[in-house]
């Protein structure tokens, strides 16, 4: 057996399958594209669903990849076991209706045992198969030559994740030797059991059935192969280390952490857990942030926040009590640079995001301690010495408090924690996660006639907008037909088309097919599984027939508007990088005739002056009349030129490059203006946040920009007319009006204060003695809480000693103020507690200091009842 680095294993795997005729699929972003069912890419096959369910036919049915993945369903086990991770790499080979079991098994065996490749001792390998999969069993037994005792039939060896492809699987195990287990009485000591001796190194899934919506299984029209080999696990064997964490994928991170902590890995098993958690979580967070995810309170952002906080908490166990995770980002970049150079390129931005989040969490820990103090005080008041499990879980889930930390503080206060309640809440969360996983992994059921259409369809719409086309296929209601008549809707494929199919954010062209037999309007164009342009049509006259010729005519006005907006998005993308930083990446776009929408990653808001600079830069490039050059290059050569490859796009070996002078260079399959001057004008309409770390700009160009600015000017002129001034003098006029308004407000406040003082004089006559305490509870006229507070302050001074509650109703809402003079505060009267009780009786809540507190209520009809309660409350204190 060879001793290989992780980079060598990855490279060797891909090279082996390339030699077997496989195309290497680049590792996709961890953030799924066009798959809302997934929070993260969580397996090698997750990015290939579109091939397996037939939505897209790949150029090569044999595919291999090294896919970065994230799974967080077992996060609590990470660091405590040898092989649980949140971030990992899956090496996989896949067949989309090409080879099947025989080749998959033979190639797996060759890769693992051949001296040219991994070179495992065949005697150390065992396999599991499904009891009913005789075909796989016979291949292993009769063709590979494995003895029967090393082929274990296990019932669970059937891969099924809901509707879609499913089938039996076979797993290959490596025997690490007796040092990892030799108890003959251990019921789990076998390949496939729960033990450390027999490690699963490869899972081969044979997708041969459709799991139908009604629960039945039917044979797939095309059988598939889906395999997965965990890189970390394979490296632990090849590098002869006890766990994945001692491999070259983790040890440099652990060594760097030792330098920060002043502690050593391998000396204390409990402290080793902290080192492992930190090493695992920084890998996950580094890659996720690099792919565009940012910490937040929901979705992916919440996962990142939770991982960082878990690592920071564990860091305390090895003496690290400051932000430090960000210092490990360059280490991750160095380890992974062979296959993921982008991590090193983005290291500064990733580190900045992580540092900000760490600093925020250190502040949050203090908040959590304050919440814990309140929880303990509440429990003690109720006569309990046990912190409820739900509260312990809330501290854990919301504030990142581990159960052990809560227990530690509880013990200091002579209290304990309800473990059973905590576990119940934890199990509910696990159930939610399991339910989510059941939903997210299912693929669409394989089938449909579109995948069977192999006829070539050529797109010529970059250069021609009117061409003569022959209809080669008509699909109506999912079935092929020979013709469709007036009023009917269908999808057609033609031999030559000028219509652009929606992709890369650019919407589809519209237009018509016109011929002697009929006319059809093109409503939409999408790509069929085999890449042809699929036109959605409505027949307006006569009939559209297969084999007939038609004039295909694109709506030139809409296309001219689309190309202006598309080239403008390229200019905008570069301007965003120039102004905001190189970390900005496209996260989605819409290029329509009437507007463009551009989503991008950015950590923070875009300031108004930054927006102005961005808009000015784009217009500057437009007015320079820069030629737009389009050419084709090999992918690696285009990237070497500095061409931007966009979010979620898959590229072939030869790519289309759009170059705008020396300013912008992008890989793009869309339609563009020949010269930036054709855009005319660019105007940003809005900028907003649409999610954690993602911003959106909407803009218009050309005539739409002119109309937008004309409308804005008209509004300005109308406002100026109403204020009897000119647009140029509008600011000065508004400044004058605001000055007048402020003066009127001051006069109004002064008058209101005098009225309040007069009302306070009147209210002093309504004071009642309750148990020797002067009490005033009254409904008054007040415009806002400030007026109420001023009135209460005035009454406190006038009365000297009193408990006061005032209520005012504005717009159906109740405002309450409670005030207690200092002498009565010392006797136990508390304005905050009083106002809370009063507010609860009119549908509200509030609180505050012992001497002054405010609240609100929703039910104005119950104000009288609420005020009546004041006397009752005072009696309860007396």
Curated annotation (Swiss-Prot):
<dbReference type="Pfam" id="PF07973">
    <property type="entry name" value="tRNA_SAD"/>
</dbReference>
<keyword id="KW-0436">Ligase</keyword>
<dbReference type="GO" id="GO:0005524">
    <property type="term" value="F:ATP binding"/>
</dbReference>
<dbReference type="InterPro" id="IPR018164">
    <property type="entry name" value="Ala-tRNA-synth_IIc_N"/>
</dbReference>
<dbReference type="GO" id="GO:0140096">
    <property type="term" value="F:catalytic activity, acting on a protein"/>
</dbReference>
<dbReference type="InterPro" id="IPR002318">
    <property type="entry name" value="Ala-tRNA-lgiase_IIc"/>
</dbReference>
<protein>
    <recommendedName>
        <fullName>Alanine--tRNA ligase</fullName>
        <ecNumber>6.1.1.7</ecNumber>
    </recommendedName>
</protein>
<dbReference type="GO" id="GO:0005829">
    <property type="term" value="C:cytosol"/>
</dbReference>
<dbReference type="Pfam" id="PF01411">
    <property type="entry name" value="tRNA-synt_2c"/>
</dbReference>
<dbReference type="InterPro" id="IPR050058">
    <property type="entry name" value="Ala-tRNA_ligase"/>
</dbReference>
<feature type="binding site">
    <location>
        <position position="566"/>
    </location>
    <ligand>
        <name>Zn(2+)</name>
    </ligand>
</feature>
<dbReference type="InterPro" id="IPR009000">
    <property type="entry name" value="Transl_B-barrel_sf"/>
</dbReference>
<dbReference type="InterPro" id="IPR023033">
    <property type="entry name" value="Ala_tRNA_ligase_euk/bac"/>
</dbReference>
<dbReference type="GO" id="GO:0002161">
    <property type="term" value="F:aminoacyl-tRNA deacylase activity"/>
</dbReference>
<dbReference type="GO" id="GO:0006419">
    <property type="term" value="P:alanyl-tRNA aminoacylation"/>
</dbReference>
<keyword id="KW-0694">RNA-binding</keyword>
<dbReference type="InterPro" id="IPR018165">
    <property type="entry name" value="Ala-tRNA-synth_IIc_core"/>
</dbReference>
<keyword id="KW-0479">Metal-binding</keyword>
<comment type="function">
    <text>Catalyzes the attachment of alanine to tRNA(Ala) in a two-step reaction: alanine is first activated by ATP to form Ala-AMP and then transferred to the acceptor end of tRNA(Ala). Also edits incorrectly charged Ser-tRNA(Ala) and Gly-tRNA(Ala) via its editing domain.</text>
</comment>
<dbReference type="GO" id="GO:0016740">
    <property type="term" value="F:transferase activity"/>
</dbReference>
<keyword id="KW-0648">Protein biosynthesis</keyword>
<keyword id="KW-0067">ATP-binding</keyword>
<dbReference type="InterPro" id="IPR012947">
    <property type="entry name" value="tRNA_SAD"/>
</dbReference>
<feature type="binding site">
    <location>
        <position position="668"/>
    </location>
    <ligand>
        <name>Zn(2+)</name>
    </ligand>
</feature>
<dbReference type="GO" id="GO:0004813">
    <property type="term" value="F:alanine-tRNA ligase activity"/>
</dbReference>
<dbReference type="InterPro" id="IPR018162">
    <property type="entry name" value="Ala-tRNA-ligase_IIc_anticod-bd"/>
</dbReference>
<feature type="binding site">
    <location>
        <position position="570"/>
    </location>
    <ligand>
        <name>Zn(2+)</name>
    </ligand>
</feature>
<dbReference type="GO" id="GO:0008270">
    <property type="term" value="F:zinc ion binding"/>
</dbReference>
<keyword id="KW-0963">Cytoplasm</keyword>
<dbReference type="InterPro" id="IPR003156">
    <property type="entry name" value="DHHA1_dom"/>
</dbReference>
<feature type="binding site">
    <location>
        <position position="672"/>
    </location>
    <ligand>
        <name>Zn(2+)</name>
    </ligand>
</feature>
<keyword id="KW-0820">tRNA-binding</keyword>
<dbReference type="GO" id="GO:0000049">
    <property type="term" value="F:tRNA binding"/>
</dbReference>
<dbReference type="InterPro" id="IPR045864">
    <property type="entry name" value="aa-tRNA-synth_II/BPL/LPL"/>
</dbReference>
<keyword id="KW-0547">Nucleotide-binding</keyword>
<dbReference type="Pfam" id="PF02272">
    <property type="entry name" value="DHHA1"/>
</dbReference>
<keyword id="KW-0862">Zinc</keyword>
<keyword id="KW-0030">Aminoacyl-tRNA synthetase</keyword>
<dbReference type="InterPro" id="IPR018163">
    <property type="entry name" value="Thr/Ala-tRNA-synth_IIc_edit"/>
</dbReference>
<comment type="similarity">
    <text>Belongs to the class-II aminoacyl-tRNA synthetase family.</text>
</comment>
């Amino acid at each position: 057996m060879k001793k290989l680095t992780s980079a060598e294993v990855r490279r060797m795997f891909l090279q082996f399958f390339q030699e077997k005729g496989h195309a290497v699929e680049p590792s996709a972003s961890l953030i799924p594209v066009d798959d809302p069912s997934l929070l993260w890419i969580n397996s090698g096959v997750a990015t290939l669903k579109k091939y397996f369910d037939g939505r897209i036919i790949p150029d090569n049915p044999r595919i291999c990849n090294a896919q970065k993945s994230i799974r967080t369903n077992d996060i609590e086990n990470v660091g405590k076991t040898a092989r649980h991770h949140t971030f990992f790499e899956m090496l996989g080979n896949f067949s989309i209706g090409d080879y099947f079991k025989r080749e998959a098994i033979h190639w797996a065996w060759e890769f693992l045992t051949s001296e040219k490749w991994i070179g495992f001792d065949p005697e150390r390998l065992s396999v599991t198969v499904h009891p009913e999969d005789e075909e796989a069993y016979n291949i292993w037994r009769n063709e590979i030559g494995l003895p029967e005792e090393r082929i274990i039939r296990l019932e669970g060896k059937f891969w099924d994740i809901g509707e879609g492809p499913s089938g039996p699987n076979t797993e290959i195990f490596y025997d690490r030797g007796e040092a990892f287990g030799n108890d003959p009485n251990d019921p789990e000591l076998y390949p496939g059991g729960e033990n450390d001796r027999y490690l699963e190194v490869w899972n081969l899934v044979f997708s041969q059935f459709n799991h139908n919506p009604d629960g039945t299984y039917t044979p797939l029209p095309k059988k598939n192969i889906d395999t997965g080999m965990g890189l970390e696990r394979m490296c632990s064997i090849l590098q002869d280390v006890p766990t994945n964490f001692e491999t070259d994928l983790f040890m440099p991170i652990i060594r760097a952490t030792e330098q920060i902590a002043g502690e050593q890995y391998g000396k204390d098993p409990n402290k080793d857990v902290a080192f492992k958690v930190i090493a695992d979580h920084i890998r996950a967070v580094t890659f996720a942030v690099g792919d565009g995810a940012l910490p937040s309170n929901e979705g992916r952002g919440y996962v990142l926040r939770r991982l960082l906080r878990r690592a920071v908490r564990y860091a305390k166990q090895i003496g690290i009590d400051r932000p430090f995770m960000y210092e490990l980002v360059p280490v991750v970049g160095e380890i992974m640079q062979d296959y993921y150079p982008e991590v090193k390129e983005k290291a500064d931005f990733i580190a900045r995001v992580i540092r900000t989040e760490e600093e925020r969490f250190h502040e949050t820990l203090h908040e959590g301690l304050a919440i814990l103090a309140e929880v303990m005080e509440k429990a003690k008041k109720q006569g309990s010495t046990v912190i409820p499990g739900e509260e312990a879980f809330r501290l854990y889930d919301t504030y990142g408090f581990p159960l052990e930390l809560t227990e530690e503080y509880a013990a200091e206060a002579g209290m304990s924690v309800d473990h059973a309640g905590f576990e119940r809440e934890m199990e509910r969360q696990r159930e939610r996660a399991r339910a989510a996983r059941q939903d997210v992994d299912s693929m669409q059921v394989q089938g449909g006639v579109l995948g069977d259409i192999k006829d070539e369809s050529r797109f010529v719409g970059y250069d021609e907008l009117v061409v003569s086309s022959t209809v080669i296929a008509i699909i109506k209601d999912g079935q092929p037909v020979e013709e469709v008549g007036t009023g009917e809707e269908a999808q057609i494929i033609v031999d030559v088309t000028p219509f652009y199919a929606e992709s890369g954010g650019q919407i589809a062209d519209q237009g018509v097919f016109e011929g002697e037999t009929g006319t059809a309007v093109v409503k939409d164009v999408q790509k069929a599984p085999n890449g042809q342009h699929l036109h959605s049509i409505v027949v307006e006259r006569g009939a559209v027939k297969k084999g007939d010729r038609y004039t295909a005519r694109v709506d030139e006005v809409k296309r001219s508007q689309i190309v202006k907006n598309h080239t403008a998005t390229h200019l905008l993308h570069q301007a965003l990088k120039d102004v905001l930083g190189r970390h900005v990446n496209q996260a989605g776009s819409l290029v329509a005739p009437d507007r463009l929408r551009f989503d991008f990653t950015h950590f923070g808001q875009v300031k108004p002056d930054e927006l102005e600079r961005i808009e000015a830069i784009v217009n500057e490039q437009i007015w320079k009349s820069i030629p737009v050059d389009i050419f084709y290059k090999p992918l690696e050569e285009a990237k070497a030129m500095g061409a931007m490859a966009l979010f979620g796009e898959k590229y072939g070996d030869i790519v289309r490059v759009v170059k705008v002078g020396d300013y912008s260079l992008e890989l793009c399959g869309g339609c563009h203006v020949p010269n930036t001057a054709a855009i005319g004008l660019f105007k940003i309409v809005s900028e907003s946040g649409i999610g954690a770390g993602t911003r959106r700009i909407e803009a218009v160009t050309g005539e739409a920009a002119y109309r937008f600015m004309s409308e804005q000017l008209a509004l300005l002129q109308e406002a100026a007319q109403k204020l009897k001034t000119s647009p140029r003098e509008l600011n000065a006029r508004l400044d004058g009006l605001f000055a007048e308004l402020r003066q009127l407000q001051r006069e109004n406040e002064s008058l209101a204060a005098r009225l309040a003082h007069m009302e306070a004089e009147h209210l002093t006559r309504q004071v009642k003695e309750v148990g020797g305490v002067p009490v005033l509870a009254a409904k008054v006229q007040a415009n806002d809480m400030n007026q109420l507070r001023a009135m209460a302050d005035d009454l406190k001074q006038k009365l000297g000693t009193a408990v006061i509650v005032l209520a005012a109703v504005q717009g159906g809402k109740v405002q309450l103020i409670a005030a207690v003079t200092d002498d009565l505060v010392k006797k136990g009267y508390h304005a905050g507690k009083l106002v809370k009780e009063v507010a609860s009786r009119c549908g509200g809540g509030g609180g505050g200091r012992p001497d002054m507190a405010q609240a609100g209520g929703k039910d104005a009809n119950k104000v009288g009842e609420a005020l009546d309660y004041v006397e009752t409350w005072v009696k309860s204190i007396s």
